Amino acid sequence: MEINEKVSKEKLIEFSGEHLYYEIWMLYGVTNSLLKGVEDEYVYNALLESFVIHASIIIDFFYRPQVYSGDARAVHYIPDVASWKEALPSYDRYFKKFHRKRNREVVHLSYKRLDVKPEEKKWNIRKIIKPIRKIVDLFLEKADPKLLHPQMQELRTKR
């Protein structure tokens, strides 16, 4: 069941300036730390888990329908939802493997973890973050600027 909740302009601005900004900012920051390389195994694992959680939250924000009242979704900010959905890259192509790997190796404690070979445990951070950055840029382009907090523009990919 999908809910099409109407959210006030004030709430959207406040939310984007605090929580949405934070999730994307953290994802970008953790990504940069991971790509620089981390010696300490505990720190690496903590950063990787943070990356997976923040990436999941952002991917859900862009792709999942609103299931529960209060779920924040990109479509709340988009005046032309049809054109947004058409422009959004394929979830299956870019994130289906990420979703499966996330479930199997990070967010579910499962005996299936025993089936993961050592060479399969590596995460291709660049392959995951690249389409997310493009989608964030697309969102900033397609969202109604009157519904976004101005600091959201800081998250645009620098070219």
Label every PLM stretch briefly:
Residues 1-49, 67-159:
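Acidic, Ser/Thr/Gly/Pro-rich intrinsically disordered interaction regions
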Residues 61-67:
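Juxtamembrane helix-break-helix junctions at the cytosolic face
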